[in-house]
Structure formats: C-alpha cells, structure tokens
UniProtKB/Swiss-Prot annotation:
Its main location: nucleus. It holds the Pfam family ORC6. Component of the origin recognition complex (ORC) that binds origins of replication. It has a role in both chromosomal replication and mating type transcriptional silencing. Binds to the ARS consensus sequence (ACS) of origins of replication. The modification Phosphothreonine is found at T146. This is Origin recognition complex subunit 6.
Length: 435
C-alpha cells in the first residue's frame, strides 16, 4: 500500500479536514503514518481477512495506532471507530483479532517504559585504531618464509596484541524492550565495529577478480597442518604450483570429481527437460518461439496455453518444447513436404536448445503435448489456416474418408446416394471456412 493511501486512512480515522492540508512530514501525523504502515505490513502475514473485510484493514491499523498514540503521548487525540468501513460490531471484533495476532507475533509481551541501552560509539576506524597486531608485510614474511626463518622470527620477536580500550557500559535495568514506531532511531547512521571488521576481513581475503588470494589459501593450509613447517622448500613450492593450477581452472576439486563421475555414468544433469518445478518467464517462451521463426499470433497462443497449465506442471520445459514443435511442424508443413531433412533439422535444433542429446525425449514431449491440445480451438484453427492435419492436407483426408465418384468401392448408383455424398463433402469443406 502506498503512503498516500495510508495517509488517507489516517485522515479518515482522525476526521481531518482535507482543505486544511495537514503536514504529514513531521509531528504526530508522521509517527501515526509510520506506525500504521508497519502494522499494515505485519498484519498481511498474520491476519487473513475476507474479501469484503480487506478494505478496512488499513483503517483498523490506523485506529490501533491512534489508540496507542492517545494512551502514550497525546491524551487529547480524537479518533473515531465509525470511520472504519464496516459494521461497528464487526469492526470491534476485527480490532480485537488484530491486537491478539500482532501482540502474539511480538517477542515482548509487557511494555516497560525504560530507557533503551545506548550503543557503543567507539570504533577502531574512527578513533585511529588498527585491526591487526603488526604490519601486514612483517606478518607475510613471518608466515610464508622458510621454516628456518619462521623459527628464528618466532624466537626473536614476541607478538603483543594491544588491548582495545574498555567498552563504556551504562547501567540499565534487566528488562529491555523494543523500540516503538513513535520513537526515532537516533543511532541509525552509526557504524558498529564488528561489522566494519568483518567487511574489512572479507575484502582482504578476496582479490579484485572475486577469487581468494593464493597467499591466504597457503596461510590456511599452513595453520591447518602443523607438520608443514618441517617440509623442505621444494615441496612447498610444488604444492603452491598445484594450487595455482587449480585456481586457474576455476573449479574446485569436488565439482571436477562430480562432473567426471557424471560423464562415466552417461547422465546429463543440465537438461532442461528434466528440470523440475522451475518458473518460466514469458520472455523465455517468446525467445524459444523466435528461434523457430513462429508468427506472433502463434507465439501468443503458446504463452496462453502455458499459463493455463503452469500451476500443475512438474517439468514445464516439456510442455513448452512440445507446444513449439507441434506449431512449428504445422507452420512449415509445405517445406517439410518438399524436403524431409527439415524434420531432422528442427528436432536437432530443439535438442541443442534443451541441452539434451536424446531425440526420444523430445519426440515423447511432442506426442504428449499433442494429446493435450488436439481438441483446443486455437490448435484446430491453426491446422485449418495452414492446411495441415497430421502432415496431410484437408482434401486428402476427405478423399481417404469419403472417397470419390471414380473409386470402385464408392460407386454412386442413385441420385439419393449422390446427394448424400455431396452433402457430406460440402459439410466438411464448410468446416475450413472462418466463422
């Protein structure tokens, strides 16, 4: 809900004169608007209303916020229950329901008017402090030098971690409370030292390209394996070379092993036809239709058919694949009759787009989807428009079904037989004419 709608509901509950143009950017009206908006957004997930009661949700939230404002800050504030667009009895019932649901969702059941504890304003960045105990260059030499140099540096230098100044703690009661919507948060712009330290550490462990530095990886390996200090320098250099090669590949060893195992089993995990419960967008469907050069009207019909059946699909790509191929076979039926290789080209192209090498899966999708849409009006109109019925023209179907006067199995002897045959032919031909 927009802020203007919230302000309109608050004005109706307080019966403010719209001609006076009250100031919503400051004062108690701003606090009431913010409190109403918070209550409204919270109640959307906590309180379910009927369709005729939904129009009063914002008014009820505005009434509850005004009541709280009246109890805590402004005893002379006037608010009216008859401004809620519901019956008074039903409005009171819904207000009790809102209070119960919203109070149960709050972790604090008893409100105590005690001062909130102040945040620590001491930050090592603002006060000129440092996060590390020594210079990074010295740390790098001590950590990644040879074992002999590491031992000497450990014996000669003693690391002293400077203690941070003590935190200023203010005595506060044991009972704390949440800040209400009417209270302004004065410390929103302050930065906490814990978050600053975490962000700086995360940036220091990552390079510009988004991958971790080799030095930090070697440092972790050095700490995890205490026996690595006694290994010769050549072994460490070979290990660092292998780690650099692995980083150059860009994939961890676990993914490489998984991909190798899948290649041995012959599985293709990236096939779109076996992807379950994925939500396809209209842009993806239109892009697939454009790949097969389908007309605009046909693409729109495919999108409509997908939206109708989208809620009960497990593998939605199978439906879209079957719809596109069935329509492609009809639209390009003339070229298919002239060149049989086009069918193979269409199926191969769909296999590459679906990221599968199994032609049987694509053909199975075509058969299943055709059973679904064979009786749809838009599909029948498409067949009539392009004169294609399972790869056969309409006149050929009539010849096979009713025969002609020249066939020996359908010789017409009397005028009545001729009239019946003529009536059937005219009826079948009339089905192809647009309504």
């Amino acid at each position: 809900m927009s802020m203007q709608q919230v302000q309109h509901c608050v004005a109706e509950v307080l019966r403010l004169d719209p001609q006076e143009k009250p100031d919503w950017s400051s004062g108690y009206l701003k606090k009431l608007t913010n409190a109403t908006s918070i209550l409204y957004n919270t109640s959307l997930n906590k309180v379910m209303l009927k369709q005729d009661e939904e129009v009063a949700r914002c008014h009820i939230c505005a009434y509850i916020a005004s009541q709280k404002m009246n109890e805590k800050h402004m005893p002379d504030l006037c608010y009216y229950i008859d401004s809620i667009p519901l019956e008074p009895k039903k409005a009171k019932h819904l207000m009790n329901l809102f209070r119960q649901s919203l109070s149960n969702s709050s972790p604090m059941k008893q409100f105590a008017w005690t001062p909130s504890p102040k945040k620590n304003k001491r930050s090592p960045v603002k006060n000129g402090g440092r996060f590390t105990s020594s210079d990074p260059k010295e740390l790098r030499n001590q950590l990644f030098g040879t074992p002999t140099k590491v031992r000497k540096s450990q014996n000669n230098d003693s690391f002293v971690i400077p203690e941070l100044p003590p935190m200023q703690t203010n005595e506060s009661p044991s009972i704390t409370r949440r800040k209400l919507a009417f209270e302004e948060d004065e410390d929103e712009d302050e930065e906490e030292p814990g978050n600053d330290g975490l962000s700086l550490k995360s940036h220091s462990n990552k390079s510009i390209t988004g991958t971790r530095n080799v030095d930090s990886d070697e440092y972790e390996n050095h700490e995890s394996d205490p026996t690595s200090e006694e290994e010769p320098l050549g072994v460490q250099e070979s290990r660092s070379g292998r780690t650099k090669q692995n980083k150059a590949v860009g994939k961890p060893q676990s993914e490489l092993k998984t991909a190798k195992a899948l290649r041995k089993r012959g599985r293709i995990p990236n096939s779109l036809l076996v992807k379950k419960y994925c939500k396809m967008t209209t842009e993806e469907i239109i892009r697939l239709c454009n790949d097969f050069e389908l007309p605009r009207e046909v693409a729109y019909k495919i999108v409509d058919e997908y939206n109708i059946n989208a809620s009960r699909l497990v593998c939605p790509w199978q439906l879209v694949c079957g719809l596109v191929l069935n329509c492609t076979f009809i639209v390009f039926n003339e070229r298919r009759r002239k060149d049989p290789r086009i069918d193979h080209f269409i199926v191969s192209k769909m296999c590459s787009l679906m990221l599968t090498s199994k032609v049987d899966d694509v053909i199975e999708c075509v058969k299943l989807v055709k059973e679904l849409i064979i009786g749809e009006k838009w599909f029948r109109d498409l067949q009539i428009r392009y004169d294609d019925f399972d790869g056969i023209r309409y006149d050929e179907i009539i010849f096979r079904k009713l025969g002609s006067m020249l066939q020996t199995t359908n010789i017409l002897v009397t005028d009545d037989q001729y009239n019946i045959w003529k009536k059937r032919i005219e009826m079948d031909l009339a089905l192809t004419e647009p309504l």
